[in-house]
Amino acid sequence: GWPYLQHRGGPAGFMKTLDEHTLGFADYSGNRQYVSTGNFLSDDRVALFFMDYPNRRRLKLLGRVRTVGPEEADTLALLEDADYPAQVERAFVIQVEAFDWNCPQHITPRFTETELAGLPRSAVPTAAVPVVKSDSISPGV
């Protein structure tokens, strides 16, 4: 079938490092389509795309994903965000197989209001700078 792309986002830190080669994140109730979960049943390959706009960096990451359910309560607890007001439905754990830092040449810097407020005035460009209202940096999964 066609390749599939699903945006996943959350507050900074929602993607957790479990060990040197493993990442994971909690999955909460959403649009009830379960497309990613269904796709992973037939093909566990995953590509993630992380953007760091203020530092003009992007990371492509390839790996194999597995779904974690209530039978692995300890893993779910590690990936849960205690401040997020929802129940964890499942988690995704990704075994990283490869990654690549891309060239920053065509990345337009963007800042959250919090990041912009923390910069010295001399560091803020005089031209319009895109400002993201939320403090979330979101990977595509």
Where are these regions (language model features)?
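Binding-site signature for planar aromatic cofactors or substrates
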Residues: 2-141
